[in-house]
Amino acid sequence: MTWEKELSELKSRRKLVEKMGGEDNIKKHNERGKLTARERISRFVDKNSFEEIMPLVGESIYENDTQTSFTPKSSIDGFALVNDRRVALSAGDFTVKGGMGKGASSASAGLGQEKSITQEALINLIPYIRLLDSAGGSVRNFEKIGRTYLPDGNSFV
């Protein structure tokens, strides 16, 4: 038995994930003077140190056992080095559904058994960094209070 078909599909999905929300959405994002989530990560972390977790999570549509479309999750999560210190980080990908998730996040993938990036940071006792890009709320408010809001859910870092 050979795994060529399955390996080919994984490679294809990886290429689709790296295209984020597609060329048009990336172009619109850049025209607004904004960096994409992957560009922000690349500029923030030590060179070539980012290790994305669960990069193939997303929403696939199949017709007759053939994948016709794939939308990646709207959050890019992983581990990296910042000034040679290991950190966990998350960046909202605004090119995918305006940064809004639809249940296809690293925390909800795989029957809910995986730990979220915030839980991984807590377990490993490393800093957790969020690279925010928001459509709502006031960033000025975050500046004024000197922090962001506390995350919802069962994980608390």
Please give the residue ranges for each predicted region:
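Terminal-region recognition feature
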Residues: 1-157
